[in-house]
Amino acid sequence: MAFEFPASFRFADSHEYANADGELVRVGISAFAVDQLGDIVFVDLPDVGDSLDKGATFGSVESVKAVEDMYAPVAGEVVQRNEAVLASPEELQNDPHGEGWLLVLRPSDPSQLEALMDAGTYGTKVNAG
């Protein structure tokens, strides 16, 4: 199965995405990662106001197969979390690049986005396996 990813998204090696929207960045996990996890049953996210370092664990996602940590693709302050995904984890599974987003961050260093893979590079990486 070949995966497609929104062209505006940037991706970390650990399969989290960052999508810049003005001064904020929406964060989630890729459709590829969601597919690998299988049925998602629980999501744990940080609180609004928490500060995250790039690469730091910011929560976890639990599926019937495994529990996986998630890592911040950029550093910043959590300004919003997706309460709908916390209440109904299947939202993440149904639309990981849309309604299944996880966090909105105010990045402390927006240039960190440039170090992430673009959608084409990420797509080539995950579709090659």
Curated annotation (Swiss-Prot):
Binds 1 lipoyl cofactor covalently. The keyword 4Fe-4S does not apply. Keywords: Lipoyl. Transmembrane segments: none annotated. It comes from the Bacteria. The keyword Metal-binding does not apply. Its cofactor is (R)-lipoate. It holds the Pfam family GCV_H. One of its GO terms (cellular component) is cytosol. GO terms for biological process: glycine decarboxylation via glycine cleavage system. Residues 24-106 form the Lipoyl-binding domain. Belongs to the GcvH family. The glycine cleavage system is composed of four proteins: P, T, L and H. HAMAP family: GcvH. This is Glycine cleavage system H protein. It comes from Parasynechococcus marenigrum (strain WH8102).
